[in-house]
Amino acid sequence: MRQHDRWPASLLLVRHAESAGNVARELAEANGDPLIDIALRDMDVPLSELGERQSRAVGLWLAGLGRRAPSVVLTSPYVRAERTASIALAAAGLELPLVLDERLREREFGVLDRLTKAGIQQRYPDQAEARSRIGKFYHRPPGGESWCDVALRVRSVLDSVTREHSGKHVMIVAHQVVILMFRYVIERLGESDVLRISREVDLANCSVTTFAVDRRNPQGMTLEQFNEVFPLEEAAAPVTREPDVPLAPR
């Protein structure tokens, strides 16, 4: 099989819609609270009402893709991602099975889970210092993951996609860092490249990032769109973003 024949025809990456956790985190950061006030496990946090509306907007956009509509859908098993995918497919009228893949889950935060910037500084100042010194690409909090760890998961997912879904239109619903790591792996970026992208943009909820197979590109696929929100704008759905916690310069 030739190199380009291994890839899907297109790869559509969608960040999950706004969740109740996004709302709680924004409130905690605004109030300077050390802890995000939500009792659920991160993987169980549901969408907000706005998040459900955003998901339907993505579905309406999917319905208009015609021959480029997804034929395969993979999603993080976290509730906010799975519900985004389910609602979008229903709104699009696409009857496709969801493939839940734990490799697409959110980055594990370990001991820093549910802590705000202020909370991390108060409870784990050593981790704040380590992240500042090492940088967030390589820093791994106790019990958690670095961005490199997420990149390893993404490489594994891409191995599966190229093996099982070559030539197909594949949609993946996942999380902010996971989507950034898809760019890192597919485009063969360096640490400084992906950190620059992270500094410049915060991925919007339900934003769309697309790659298409490109026979002129030795890497196999070319980035077509990144962090686009036109599906939301076309449906007059509010755009929301959850910025990365700025523990250290990015």
Predicted regions and their residues:
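Glycine-rich phosphate-binding loop signature in dinucleotide/nucleotide-binding domains
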Residues: 65-69, 161-168
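Phosphate-handling substructures
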Residues: 20-46, 91-155, 222-227, 235-242, ...
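Short, well-ordered beta-to-alpha junction loops that form the rim of enzyme active sites
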Residues: 16-17, 75-79, 97, 103, ...
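Short, active-site-adjacent cap segments at secondary-structure transitions
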Residues: 20, 80-82, 106-107, 178-180
